[in-house]
């Protein structure tokens, strides 16, 4: 077995991965706040951590992957007001758009995709524990976490409290005992979402959402917590504080993994700067696999400069790889050097370089190298289409909609997505997935606890 190494933000060094339970690796990744289409910067962690999960599944017998959806937030309230639609209409449509983008990018579906609004009781319970233990206090109908009570606060970001406050958008309100204290629960007016609680009608703060949901699905202490580097402070710092204090634990997660920014003209791509490009818009003239490849070309911790040329070059690279594996199907183990590269802190540039070496040898007649390349493609999440379809549709999003040659992995991904839709009572989406598979002559058979499929 290849030894997996990951850069741990908490320790500020590359560390060997030592799982809590090798029989079940547990990973939590911060998901989207659902008020708009995701942009290419949002897509980077989705793709990178998807590769990490694929590597983990290659190395270990079971991986429990949780990625949340934040569907209660002031940005959501404001956007619904601007569009003059209900909040549920906005969030349901945005979640559907998000799932469509993830499918186009070739991402696996997490085992659990909890929504914040379905876990309010768990959040209230955790807040009650923090108040009881003296880590939180009530002020002006708000519940706040007292950072002075947690002596390890600032350990993840490595900054002093003064630095963190001055360098962030922390709201310094007069009801706070300390400027760095953060909201666990806040009151809601009649025109915005709210839930009954011991502190009156209100809604949760952002940070408590992830603490409550990760605890429910992964427990007090799990292996990996992942997210963008912009989440280190305050989000992840605050998650650690409230989780450790509520759960009487020294660690929330053993490994904290963060990806770097995507830049446009040298600036971080973000919605606040308005210099972003949504995946939805990119798919009008490209395909998800080329976008995915683009996001794998730089090491995940380094900044990634993105532009139209980036996708064009990715498309050419994929064409070269598809040509090399023409006629081959996955049959056997992945190339050990590619797996070794990915096990070395998810070094996708090295893995892609190795893939192109194998393609060179395959194009010179080496069937062994062609087979190794095809066998390795699923770990990177590429080359899932037939070569014929790629060269027919690869320059457009039509390839994302062509299901005539759907493979087993794609079928299982769609079945899991349908399962999540049914759990979320989104029966319309569940029926759409069933109908999509039926067009490919795939018949689903639902049984208690499992869905089987067969070709008609």
Predicted regions and their residues:
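Short Gly/Ser/Thr- and Asp/Glu-enriched loop/turn motifs at secondary-structure junctions
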Residues: 109, 139-140, 446-450
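N-terminal, positively charged, Ser/Thr/Ala/Gly-biased leader segments
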Residues: 100-136
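Short catalytic-loop micro-motif centered on adjacent basic/acidic residues
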Residues: 110-114, 225-227, 363-367
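Alpha-helical recognition segments enriched in aromatics with Gly/Pro capping
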Residues: 1-35, 50, 121-330
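Acidic carboxylate-rich catalytic motifs and surrounding loops in phosphoryl-/glycosyl-chemistry enzymes
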Residues: 67, 112-118, 142, 259
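N-terminal, positively charged nucleic-acid-binding surface of large information/translation enzymes
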Residues: 11-14, 20-106, 444-446, 453
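Structural preference for alpha-helix termini/caps and helix-kink/transition segments
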Residues: 268-456
């Amino acid at each position: 077995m290849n030894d997996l190494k990951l850069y741990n933000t908490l320790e500020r060094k590359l560390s060997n991965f030592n799982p809590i339970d090798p029989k079940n690796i547990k990973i939590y990744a911060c998901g989207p706040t659902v008020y708009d289409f995701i942009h290419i910067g949002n897509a980077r962690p989705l793709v990178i951590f998807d590769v990490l999960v694929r590597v983990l599944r290659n190395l270990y017998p079971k991986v429990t992957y949780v990625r949340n959806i934040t569907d209660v937030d002031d940005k959501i309230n404001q956007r619904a007001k601007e569009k003059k639609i209900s909040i549920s209409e906005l969030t349901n449509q945005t979640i559907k758009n998000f799932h469509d983008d993830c499918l186009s990018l070739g991402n696996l579906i997490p085992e659990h995709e909890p929504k914040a609004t379905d876990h309010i009781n768990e959040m209230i319970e955790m807040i009650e524990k923090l108040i009881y233990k003296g880590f939180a206090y009530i002020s002006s109908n708000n519940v706040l976490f007292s950072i002075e009570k947690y002596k390890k606060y600032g350990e993840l970001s490595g900054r002093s409290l003064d630095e963190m406050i001055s360098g962030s958008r922390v709201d310094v309100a007069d009801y706070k005992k300390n400027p760095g204290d953060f909201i666990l629960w806040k009151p809601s007016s009649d025109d915005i979402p709210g839930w009954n609680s011991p502190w009156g009608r209100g809604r949760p703060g952002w940070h408590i959402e992830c603490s409550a949901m990760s605890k429910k699905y992964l427990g007090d202490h799990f292996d990996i917590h992942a997210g963008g580097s912009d989440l280190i402070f305050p989000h992840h710092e605050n998650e650690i504080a409230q989780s450790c204090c509520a759960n009487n634990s020294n660690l929330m997660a053993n490994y904290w993994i963060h990806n770097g920014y995507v830049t446009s003209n040298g600036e971080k791509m973000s919605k606040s700067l308005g210099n972003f490009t949504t995946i939805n818009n990119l798919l009008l003239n490209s395909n998800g696999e080329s976008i995915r490849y683009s996001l794998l070309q730089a090491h995940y911790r380094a900044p990634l400069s993105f532009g139209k040329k980036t996708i064009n070059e990715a498309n050419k690279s994929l064409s070269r790889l598809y040509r090399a594996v023409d006629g081959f199907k996955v049959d056997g183990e992945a190339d050990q050097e590619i797996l070794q590269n990915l096990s070395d802190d998810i070094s996708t540039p090295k893995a892609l370089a190795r893939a192109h070496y194998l393609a060179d040898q395959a194009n010179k007649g080496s069937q062994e190298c062609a087979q190794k390349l095809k066998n390795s493609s699923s770990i990177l999440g590429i080359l899932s289409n037939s070569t014929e379809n790629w060269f027919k549709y690869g320059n457009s999003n039509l390839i994302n909609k062509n299901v005539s040659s759907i493979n087993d992995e794609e079928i299982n991904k769609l079945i899991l997505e349908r399962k999540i839709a049914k759990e979320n009572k989104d029966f319309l989406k569940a029926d759409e997935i069933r109908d999509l598979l039926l067009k490919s002559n795939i018949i689903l058979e639902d049984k208690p606890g499992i869905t089987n499929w067969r070709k008609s």
